[in-house]
Amino acid sequence: MRECISIHVGQAGVQIGNACWELYCLEHGIQPDGQMPSDKTVGGGDDSFNTFFSETGAGKHVPRAVFVDLEPTVVDEVRTGTYRQLFHPEQLITGKEDAANNYARGHYTIGKEIVDLVLDRIRKLADQCTGLQGFLIFHSFGGGTGSGFTSLLMERLSVDYGKKSKLEFAVYPAPQVSTAVVEPYNSILTTHTTLEHSDCAFMVDNEAIYDICRRNLDIERPTYTNLNRLIGQIVSSITASLRFDGALNVDLTEFQTNLVPYPRIHFPLVTYAPVISAEKAYHEQLSVAEITNACFEPANQMVKVDPRHGKYMACCMLYRGDVVPKDVNAAIATIKTKRTIQFVDWCPTGFKVGINYQPPTVVPGGDLAKVQRAVCMLSNTTAIAEAWARLDHKFDLMYAKRAFVHWYVGEGMEEGEFSEAREDLAALEKDYEEVGMDSGDGEGEGAEEY
């Protein structure tokens, strides 16, 4: 088997985890207590879902997941929620005091105390796997636990499981809406530390998702539940190929092979379509061409950047539902001809397609309409550098005055770590710039030398 272990860190990671596992259970016909009614064997005995669930002797399906937070309130909601019986109590790990939005607390002082317990639990999950293929790590960049503890955990996972893939789903601090003043510090410190340990990182920007909820789903004031259910759909699309038999089965390593041209350039942009409310869907049926087109609308992206300013290096289209290759090829051909999509000149083909015949499932009482087909596009574009530039600028404004730095130094960090992290991100921006250059101008060798 090709199992994946999901690790949900901090408030954002745990709440996205709730949305994802709720959706996985619905997709696979698993009840909140982990039982799978025998009459509901989906698709006549397709056991691909075992990549995400392990089965106990009593016939209960348990998620291969760990929920970690340095303070208990958010995980307590899982412990008392609808899905409390789904998880083994030891999978839900909490500390006593939180990281207080401070990377240094998550990475050094508070995180250190809990990391061995977490690794021990992950080891137990890994031992149940016959062929572990990697880890999916869910966290935010802005929080103290999400940034600090995640980077600590990634470093330790690299030591213990060197060859296994590690994919991140990270919540990027929204340009306008902020939950903490020190988000830019935490984001840059965590990006610097995890850059060499992460194989592929899908970023999600709260503000972009707010806008999608407001515009496409007509929700006036979206709550985190609305946002997380949408993120859950996206994560589900990305992992569907691991959990169902598809025509073109994509596994974790295959993502990287096709999306990551250089080790550091591993931040694909995620776009999902159709995001549509039930009232609207009632009146329209979306064709493959329409949803494919929608993927190239900046409005449907999960991070606010403008791909028209960048160049594409690779594109992965993951379709699910009633989709045939003929329609997909036609849709992509049309896009190639009429769209203003620029590919870098050293990567001419650039489209990889995966199809899963399982149509998207929706959460009952949720906001999304039930649709026949959906697509999730993962594209590696140089435009994502805009997101880094934005963050770096905010970092610079604060760091020039050394604002808030004493909180980090007080927890045992050195000021040098800030400048080191900042330099690494400057290098990352430069890497993106070089990758986007045509092979003709300058020395095309720049990107290969790290």
From Swiss-Prot:
Gene giving rise to this polypeptide: alphaTub84D
E.C. no: 3.6.5.-
Post-translational modifications reported in the UniProt record: Undergoes a tyrosination/detyrosination cycle, the cyclic removal and re-addition of a C-terminal tyrosine residue by the enzymes tubulin tyrosine carboxypeptidase (TTCP) and tubulin tyrosine ligase (TTL), respectively.
Compartments where located: Cytoplasm, Cytoskeleton
Catalytic function, reaction form: GTP + H2O = GDP + phosphate + H(+)
Protein family according to the UniProt entry: Belongs to the tubulin family.
Subunit structure, as described in the record: Dimer of alpha and beta chains. A typical microtubule is a hollow water-filled tube with an outer diameter of 25 nm and an inner diameter of 15 nM. Alpha-beta heterodimers associate head-to-tail to form protofilaments running lengthwise along the microtubule wall with the beta-tubulin subunit facing the microtubule plus end conferring a structural polarity. Microtubules usually have 13 protofilaments but different protofilament numbers can be found in some organisms and specialized cells.
Site features described as Involved in polymerization, chain residue numbers: Y450
Active site per database record: E254
Binding positions (Mg(2+)): E71
Entry function: Tubulin is the major constituent of microtubules, a cylinder consisting of laterally associated linear protofilaments composed of alpha- and beta-tubulin heterodimers. Microtubules grow by the addition of GTP-tubulin dimers to the microtubule end, where a stabilizing cap forms. Below the cap, tubulin dimers are in GDP-bound state, owing to GTPase activity of alpha-tubulin.
GO CC annotations on file: cytoplasm; microtubule; perinuclear region of cytoplasm
Domain of life: Eukaryota
GO molecular function annotation: GTP binding; hydrolase activity; metal ion binding; myosin binding; structural constituent of cytoskeleton
Species: Drosophila melanogaster (Fruit fly)
Keywords for the protein's UniProt record, in alphabetical order: Acetylation, Cytoplasm, Cytoskeleton, GTP-binding, Hydrolase, Magnesium, Metal-binding, Microtubule, Nucleotide-binding
Cofactor entry: Mg(2+)
Major subcellular location class: cytoplasm
Signal sequence coordinates: none
Positions of post-translational N6-acetyllysine modification: K40
Transmembrane segments: none
Stated name of the protein: Tubulin alpha-3 chain
InterPro entries: Alpha_tubulin, Tub_FtsZ_C, Tubulin, Tubulin/FtsZ-like_C, Tubulin/FtsZ_2-layer-sand-dom, Tubulin/FtsZ_GTPase_sf, Tubulin_C, Tubulin_CS
A GO biological-process term: microtubule cytoskeleton organization
